């Protein structure tokens, strides 16, 4: 059995934002949706207007929406318990509104109008066992005392197991291992660095130079 270094909470999966058609009565809106695990809100804090702030989306048949969306759909900010219809791929499915979130500020790193259970995404069944799938970020909260390097080291065997074919192809094509002898490695990126990260030849790099350069030029212009 291969196991990771213990984490404070299990990994939280989150797709890139999708537009989802949400209907109630005669009202239809294309909303900015985020497909997340039901315990997503145990790591990220989104103030709740109505409902359980720790678990505003308690099961796979529930969704959480913002005050603004509730007002648009139902004519009131208290839409708790109402049934909405969501276009999930080619199917229309009913969901219960179990949480009303306060409107998310525009400058938030994570911004959406409706949160939907991750397992209901139209591609979930196709890719649930595809370990090389990279279409969504995965967030991990480490247990207190566990360092990033310790966690990454604990994932080496897991990476080898689930990426064997890819690694063999890399070796065949002449790829060189990193300083630790790894051809593929799971790496963690601190959330504070997410806006400074980019991939160069499939290697994650964090560069803060450009934003600070722009900021410096702005200050120079102001003082001139």
Regions found by a protein language model. Give the residues of each.
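Hydrophobic alpha-helical transmembrane segments of multi-pass inner-membrane transport and secretion
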Residues: 205-224
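Mid-to-C-terminal secondary-structure elements
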Residues: 34-49, 62-205
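Short amphipathic beta-strand/extended segments in non-transmembrane regions
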Residues: 1-49, 162-169
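Short, flexible micro-motifs
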Residues: 54, 102, 221
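Short hydrophobic/aromatic segments of transmembrane alpha-helices and their interfaces
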Residues: 24-25, 53, 130-132, 215
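Aromatic/His-enriched, Gly/Pro-containing loop or helix-boundary segments
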Residues: 59
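Short, solvent-exposed loop/turn elements at beta->coil junctions and helix N-caps
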Residues: 17-23, 53-55, 84-86
């Amino acid at each position: 059995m291969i196991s990771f270094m213990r984490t404070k909470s299990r990994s939280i999966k989150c797709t890139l934002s999708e537009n989802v058609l949400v209907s109630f009565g005669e009202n239809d809106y294309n909303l900015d949706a985020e497909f997340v695990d039901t315990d997503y809100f145990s790591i990220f804090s989104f103030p709740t207007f109505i409902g359980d702030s720790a678990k505003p989306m308690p099961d796979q048949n529930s969704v959480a929406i913002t005050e603004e969306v509730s007002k648009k759909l139902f004519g009131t900010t208290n839409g708790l318990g109402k049934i909405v219809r969501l276009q999930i791929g080619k199917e229309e499915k009913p969901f219960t509104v179990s949480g009303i979130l306060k409107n998310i500020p525009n400058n938030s790193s994570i911004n959406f109008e409706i949160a939907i259970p991750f397992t209901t995404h139209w591609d979930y069944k196709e890719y649930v066992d595809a370990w090389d799938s990279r279409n969504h970020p995965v967030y991990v909260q480490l247990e207190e005392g566990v360092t990033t390097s310790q966690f990454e080291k604990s994932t080496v065997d897991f990476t080898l197991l689930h990426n064997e074919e890819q690694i063999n192809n890399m070796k065949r094509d002449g790829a060189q291992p990193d300083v630790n002898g790894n051809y593929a490695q799971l790496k963690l990126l601190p959330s504070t660095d997410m806006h400074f990260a980019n991939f160069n030849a499939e290697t994650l790099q964090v560069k803060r130079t450009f934003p600070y350069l722009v900021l410096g030029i702005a200050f120079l212009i102001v003082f001139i």
